[in-house]
Amino acid sequence: MRLPAARHVAIALVGILACDDTTGPSASQVEQYRAQWLEHQIHDYAYQYLSTGFFNSLSGQSIQVTVRADTVRAATFVASGDTVPAGLAVLPTIAQLFDGAEAAAANGTLKAMRLDPTLTYPTELEFSGPPDASGTLRISHFQVLP
């Protein structure tokens, strides 16, 4: 009995998808990346933050975040320059990004993590889970402040 060509393709795709490893880094790998970041001893910096997914009011909006002494001190929308009304506590420092990545890696919801090749801070974190807990965080335009 011959299988139709479309069925061969479907069987091949199932085989490929079944072999696809979508597991992100382990909690111990995230811990190693954090240690590399900490070696730089950067406590004052700014970056642009973009979250997509997560079903919150900040999703899809680029935000300029300023961190001084390892604490978020200011946050403004890049497009308008307006202050973010949600409060500074909802925006992460790099250390808090690592905290979230490590927790997600431990419970299996960290899908991917991309790092800056020089300073080893996360540039992108992808999370999988229920719709309100799935999405991507992107860090760009990072600069060390004096």
Language model features with spans:
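A short, Trp-centered hydrophobic/proline-enriched beta-strand micro-motif
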Residues: 40-51
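Short, surface-exposed coil-to-beta transition loops
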Residues: 57-63, 134-139
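Short, flexible N-terminal segments of the mature chain
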Residues: 61-75
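Extracytosolic low-complexity repeat regions of secreted or lipid-anchored proteins
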Residues: 106-127
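Short, exposed beta-strand-loop hairpins at the edges of beta-sheets
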Residues: 122-138
